[in-house]
């Protein structure tokens, strides 16, 4: 992502570099690198063709910046659901099996869990009509509590709503202004154990 952010790599060349430089056969896209192209069919066709030309499978799209699916404000939460629908459509066109979303929101663990369960269920209902999974990564805050996130996913009651366990992202609270200083961390081994039963992809890390 640093290469993409630095402008040294165009999103359209991602599949080519993945295959030719690293010898890999699958890619996970980040929506931030084609933020205004979710409904741009010419662009999406180009992305799909380039992946196909290099024998690369489009696996999923990681979606950020589209609102909080765990927002306590119903109107804002439903707007977030609506904002994500276009990425479900784009992912389906590209041949992905999932979109990765965040279960973020403000409030107590119980308040955010209730809101996130509703928001994820609503988005997953739409995802189901498109044959698309909606998966949540442990991505800071309440979502980095494995038990909390597993219960949210379970309570949606949707088979296509799952997790994307990140093996190294179980920091619940960080020092303000210092991303590297974790103040509260969930046990990563327990967290992986909590989340794997609902996993439809993983973000594996090793030292």
Predicted regions mapped to residue ranges:
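Glycine-/small-residue-rich active-site loops that bind phosphorylated ligands and cofactors
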Residues: 107-108, 141
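Basic- and aromatic-lined ligand-binding clefts that recognize polyanionic substrates
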Residues: 127-160, 167, 172
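Flexible glycine/acidic-rich beta-alpha junction loops that bind and position SAM and/or redox cofactors
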Residues: 2, 107, 168, 172-178
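Extracellular glycoside hydrolase catalytic/binding regions
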Residues: 152, 171-189, 201, 205
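Residue-level signal for the nucleotide or nucleotide-sugar donor/cofactor binding architecture
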Residues: 6-9, 144, 183, 190
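Structural motif
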Residues: 61, 102, 137-139
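N-terminal pre-domain/capping segments
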Residues: 1-94, 98, 110-114, 118-121, ...
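Structural alpha-helical scaffold elements that stabilize or flank donor/cofactor-binding regions
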Residues: 191-195
């Amino acid at each position: 992502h640093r290469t993409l952010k630095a402008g040294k790599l165009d999103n359209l060349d991602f599949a080519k570099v993945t295959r030719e430089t690293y010898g890999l056969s699958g890619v996970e896209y980040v929506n931030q690198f084609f933020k205004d192209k979710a409904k741009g069919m010419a662009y999406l066709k180009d992305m799909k063709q380039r992946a196909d030309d290099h024998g690369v499978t489009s696996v999923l799209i990681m979606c950020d910046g589209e609102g909080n699916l765990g927002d306590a404000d119903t109107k804002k939460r439903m707007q977030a659901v609506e904002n994500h629908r276009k990425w479900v459509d784009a992912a389906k066109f590209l041949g992905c099996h999932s979109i990765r979303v965040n279960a973020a929101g403000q409030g107590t663990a119980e308040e955010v869990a209730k809101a996130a369960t509703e928001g994820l269920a609503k988005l997953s209902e739409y995802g189901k009509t498109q044959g698309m999974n909606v998966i949540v990564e442990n991505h800071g805050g309440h979502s980095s509590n494995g038990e909390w996130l597993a219960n949210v996913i379970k309570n949606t009651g949707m088979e296509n709503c799952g997790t994307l366990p990140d093996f190294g992202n179980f920091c619940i609270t960080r020092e303000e202004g210092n991303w590297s200083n974790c103040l509260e961390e969930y046990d990563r081994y327990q967290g992986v154990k909590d989340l794997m039963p609902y996993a439809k992809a993983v973000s594996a890390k090793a030292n």
